[in-house]
């Protein structure tokens, strides 16, 4: 029986990156052997065991043979005669198919180290096409390692495009698509994930609402980048900058809202382009459709829909009437969900800066709207009750006093 460290731990170690999870492969053993050594079996689909001391996962070396469509249609063989090389070749990319022996030797039968040095994401064998989930995984790795200079090999991109056209992607469950996508949203360059999926044709299959933005023009005066898909990717990049060092915000929810904020632009009638009157309200339906299909968590969906509907309100914050401001606060339920409103404001800032040449633009609207929010929050509900108001009258009086507080703050707010 031999044990090897495999996959991501070896890859990241060679890249000089911190190793998060360590996976191990056991060659020349069967389940009975590991159980006798005190390992605990946890895998249902294939034998995975927890080390009694470290609690790290140890899997028996295995081979896989495609038996039906999708990413679950495989027949596995876990016999003790399976070699390390046979196990490694079933993996997706060469850089993920290296192993390290217990004495520290790197075993690299498929050129992963060379591809690591050359910054290339390359599939190992034609068997790559047997698992459609790999299209998303490779796009996610491209997003993760883009800042280190990694590119996807042209032949791998071609295989990904073939998979996108084959109909195999339709066999992916909503849960798996969303899991990969949420992971991608938390990478350093999530825009690369979506750009890669667009390049391979997978975006139109899995995220048609986002893909529909491609080629939709905006007025060049406000959007020198013109294209709505390019703008959305620039907004996503800005959202990353604004959230990566902010532990309070829900990073992936903010980034998802950034992607959805302009989905309504894909529905703009041709005869009024490049203007997009009413795109805010129009964006709610495609956002809802996307979220329902992919079973996106409700928090993400709510923030994305509200962002679609109200992002231009913040751009025009200085023009809003006090009544409109309170209606906005009520729609966001800022009284009970203050963080969600702050996350929304970050998307609005990302939207302003996600335009070519506007990357460092000041956005005083956030300070202004937060001052109005502070004033509205200062209104004491207990005082309203103490003043003798009851039931619905409490809510009506509270709204009146909040509107008055906002009006006073607007009047006193410095305009220069």
UniProtKB/Swiss-Prot annotation:
Domain HD: 228-335
The EC number(s) this enzyme carries: 2.7.7.72, 3.1.3.-, 3.1.4.-
Keyword Nucleus included in the entry's annotation: no
Signal sequence extent: none
GO biological process, one term: tRNA surveillance
Single GO MF annotation: CCA tRNA nucleotidyltransferase activity
Record keywords: ATP-binding, Hydrolase, Magnesium, Metal-binding, Multifunctional enzyme, Nickel, Nucleotide-binding, Nucleotidyltransferase, RNA repair, RNA-binding, Transferase, tRNA processing
Listed InterPro entries: CCA_bact, HD/PDEase_dom, HD_domain, NT_sf, PolA_pol_head_dom, PolyA_RNA-bd, tRNA_CCA-adding_enzyme
Cofactor(s) essential for the protein: Mg(2+); Ni(2+)
Record-listed ATP binding positions: 8, 11, 91, 137, 140
Cofactor: record remark: Magnesium is required for nucleotidyltransferase activity.
Catalysed reactions, semicolon-separated: a tRNA precursor + 2 CTP + ATP = a tRNA with a 3' CCA end + 3 diphosphate; a tRNA with a 3' CCA end + 2 CTP + ATP = a tRNA with a 3' CCACCA end + 3 diphosphate
Domain comment, as recorded: Comprises two domains: an N-terminal domain containing the nucleotidyltransferase activity and a C-terminal HD domain associated with both phosphodiesterase and phosphatase activities.
HAMAP family, A to Z: CCA_bact_type1, CCA_bact_type2
Additional observations: A single active site specifically recognizes both ATP and CTP and is responsible for their addition.
Quaternary structure, from the entry: Monomer. Can also form homodimers and oligomers.
Physiological role: Catalyzes the addition and repair of the essential 3'-terminal CCA sequence in tRNAs without using a nucleic acid template. Adds these three nucleotides in the order of C, C, and A to the tRNA nucleotide-73, using CTP and ATP as substrates and producing inorganic pyrophosphate. tRNA 3'-terminal CCA addition is required both for tRNA processing and repair. Also involved in tRNA surveillance by mediating tandem CCA addition to generate a CCACCA at the 3' terminus of unstable tRNAs. While stable tRNAs receive only 3'-terminal CCA, unstable tRNAs are marked with CCACCA and rapidly degraded.
Similarity annotation: Belongs to the tRNA nucleotidyltransferase/poly(A) polymerase family. Bacterial CCA-adding enzyme type 1 subfamily.
Name the record gives this protein: Multifunctional CCA protein
């Amino acid at each position: 029986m031999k044990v090897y460290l495999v996959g991501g731990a070896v890859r990241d170690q060679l890249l000089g990156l911190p190793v998060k999870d360590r996976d191990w492969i056991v060659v020349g053993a069967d389940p009975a052997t590991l159980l006798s050594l005190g390992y605990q079996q946890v895998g249902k689909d294939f034998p995975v065991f927890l080390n009694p001391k470290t609690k790290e996962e140890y899997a028996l070396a295995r081979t896989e043979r495609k038996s039906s469509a999708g990413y679950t249609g495989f027949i596995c063989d876990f016999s003790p005669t399976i070699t390390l090389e046979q196990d490694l070749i079933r993996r997706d990319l060469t850089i993920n198919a290296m192993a390290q022996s217990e004495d520290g030797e790197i075993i690299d039968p498929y050129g992963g180290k060379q591809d690591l040095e050359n910054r290339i994401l390359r599939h190992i064998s034609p068997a790559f096409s047997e698992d459609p989930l790999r299209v998303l995984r490779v796009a996610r790795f491209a997003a993760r390692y883009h800042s280190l200079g990694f590119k996807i090999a042209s032949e791998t991109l071609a295989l990904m495009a073939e998979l996108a056209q084959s109909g195999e992607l339709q066999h992916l469950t909503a849960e798996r698509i969303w899991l990969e996508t949420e992971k991608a949203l938390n990478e350093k360059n999530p825009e690369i994930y979506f750009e890669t999926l667009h390049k391979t044709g997978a975006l139109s299959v899995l995220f048609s609402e986002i893909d529909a933005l491609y080629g939709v023009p905006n007025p060049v005066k406000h959007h020198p980048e013109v294209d709505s898909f390019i703008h959305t990717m620039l907004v996503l990049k800005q959202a990353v900058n604004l959230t990566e060092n902010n532990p309070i915000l829900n990073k992936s929810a903010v980034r998802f809202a950034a992607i959805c904020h302009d989905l309504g632009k894909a529905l703009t009638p041709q005869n009024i382009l490049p203007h997009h009157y009413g795109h805010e309200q129009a964006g709610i339906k495609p956002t809802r459709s996307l979220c329902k299909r992919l079973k996106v968590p409700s928090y993400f969906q709510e923030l994305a829909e509200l962002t679609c509907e109200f992002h231009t309100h913040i751009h025009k914050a200085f023009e809003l009437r006090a009544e409109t401001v309170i209606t906005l606060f009520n729609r966001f339920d800022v009284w009970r969900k203050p963080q969600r409103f702050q996350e929304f404001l970050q998307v609005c800032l990302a939207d302003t800066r996600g335009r070519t040449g506007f990357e460092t633009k000041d956005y005083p609207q956030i300070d202004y709207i937060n001052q109005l929010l502070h004033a509205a929050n200062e209104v004491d509900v207990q005082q309203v009750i103490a003043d003798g108001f009851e039931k619905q009258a409490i809510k009506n009086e509270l709204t009146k006093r909040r509107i008055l507080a906002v009006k006073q703050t607007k009047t006193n707010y410095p305009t220069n």
